[in-house]
Curated annotation (Swiss-Prot):
Its cofactor is pyridoxal 5'-phosphate. This is L-cysteine desulfhydrase-like protein lolT1. Keywords: Alkaloid metabolism, Lyase, Pyridoxal phosphate. Pathway: Alkaloid biosynthesis. Its EC number is 4.4.1.-. It comes from Epichloe uncinata (Endophyte fungus).
Length: 454
């Protein structure tokens, strides 16, 4: 099969086009992702070319393909090519942006209670040596997008009342876990109205739903490509609006593209970066080379985009299918477990909430935690788990899923319950979610019967 083959139907037929063990059910695209066999062949071919003539490939061929990759990604996210550069992952992209900010004492970096842990740690680390403060907007799920926006506005007003300036807000498109789609479009509009710069963590965005940066107009945006775009890991795209590119003084680590304030960038005379820099902006040149790095995943972006177009039927078809499958599959699991899906409270029958407008779904398991808030019922069949039992229960559950059912599902304890996150994908179908639901039911019953040690 080549990328020019006719379209393959979604579901089980599509699985044959991917590299996974047919006995393995990948319900966790939002962590490691997956890629087709043609992309796997592409990366091996590039490795062979690199090893056959290392310097010639690096200097003359690699840059051309990387430029093609940037052009493809820019078209995908509706942005100028000059605003899109390649980085290894979202964490690197976000920290690079933060590292380049000239913070002042009264500046505040705003995060949400759902901000990804690695980003939280990075901000805390940077705050130890930089003159800025942090504030977190607290809220609990489930809730509504309207309430999140309202709490955000209230928090911004309080920051200003304290004599501080909300300088930069880190917003998410989709919360990692428990996974829901955030009202990031509305939050962006609030920030733009109030003059707050925005850094959008779109880790789970590109390849899962349409991203239109021309319409959204964030200051900074970064998304992994290896989660949903069928690109080998690690690979991500960093968008910096042209109006903000003067802020980006250095990559991490600082390399040849750096331009000192009192001089010019000193590129090696023999490097193809010299000729490239004649047409590229200083921002593009800055990211053209960052020490000795593995660019192989980035080189596969064009092949992945062709596969999505020619074999999958295009981006719109992919988005529609995985959104539908996450909805149907999540509802199926909740029905099997007699629980619920995480979404806005109080939705009427047949009403789709915005928080499920994506290809990921979070389902509550029938495992309550005794010390949880009042959201947990007074009685759960088998008895609620004690705090000491939660860790062993989660480990037992994930190990049983892996060993018995050949799958992996991220599990989290949240607000007095245990929850599971599942991802739809083009090679999955409702029967895969049904399998997951039945498997979770069996294992949860074992946990409630305290059979974990048997």
């Amino acid at each position: 099969m080549t990328v020019n083959s006719k379209r393959i139907p979604f579901g089980k037929p599509m699985l044959e086009a991917f590299c996974m063990d047919p006995e393995y059910t990948n319900l966790n695209s939002s962590s490691c992702g997956s890629w087709p066999k043609v992309v796997s062949k592409q990366i091996r071919d590039y490795w062979s070319l690199l090893e056959a003539q290392p310097d010639l490939f690096s200097e003359f061929s690699q840059g051309l393909v990387l430029q093609e990759a940037r052009i493809g990604l820019a078209h995908l996210v509706h942005a100028a090519v000059s605003e899109c550069v390649l980085v290894s992952n979202v964490t690197t992209g976000i920290f690079t942006v933060l590292y380049n900010q000239a913070f002042e004492e009264r500046d505040v970096v705003v995060t949400l209670s759902t901000t990804y842990g690695a980003i939280d740690h990075g901000i805390t680390s940077l705050a130890e040596t930089r003159p800025f403060k942090t504030r977190r907007v607290e809220f609990e799920l489930p809730t509504t997008g309207q309430k999140i926006v309202s709490q955000f506005e209230t928090a911004m007003a309080q920051i200003r009342a304290d004599g501080l300036r909300p300088r930069l807000a880190i917003l998410e498109t989709i919360v990692s876990i428990p996974a829901v789609r955030m009202p990031f479009e509305d939050l962006l509009r609030v920030c733009q109205k109030e003059g707050i710069m925005t850094l959008v963590d779109g880790a789970h965005s590109v390849g899962q739903f349409e991203v239109n940066l021309q319409e959204l107009q964030p200051d900074f945006f970064v998304s992994d490509c290896h989660k949903w775009l069928f690109v080998p890991r690690p690979c991500a795209v960093l968008y910096v609006a042209e109006r903000n590119q003067h802020m980006m003084r250095s990559v991490i680590p600082t390399s040849f593209g750096f331009i000192p304030k009192n001089g010019n960038s000193r590129l090696p005379l023999w490097s193809q970066m010299v000729s490239a820099s004649e047409t590229a902006s200083s921002f593009e040149t800055l990211f053209a080379y960052t020490a000795t790095s593995d660019y192989m995943p980035h080189l596969c972006i064009p092949a992945a985009l062709r596969f999505r177009r020619d074999v999958c039927g295009g981006e719109a078809a992919i988005y529609e299918y995985i959104k539908w499958l996450a909805k149907e599959g999540g509802d199926k699991i909740a029905d099997i477990l007699q629980t619920e899906v995480l979404e806005e409270p109080g939705l009427g029958a047949g009403v789709d909430g915005q928080m499920r407008n994506c290809g990921i779904v979070t389902v509550r398991l029938p495992l309550a935690i005794a010390t949880g808030p009042s959201t947990a019922p007074a009685h759960v069949p088998g008895g609620a788990l004690t705090e000491k039992e939660v860790g062993p229960a989660v480990r037992y559950l994930t190990k049983a899923l892996a060993e018995r059912y050949k799958t992996w599902i991220p599990i989290i304890d949240y607000r007095g319950w245990i929850w599971a996150r599942l991802c739809a994908q083009v090679y999955l179908e409702v029967s895969d979610f049904e399998m997951a639901g039945n498997s979770l039911k069996v294992i949860c019953e074992e946990i409630l019967n305290r059979e974990m040690g048997q």
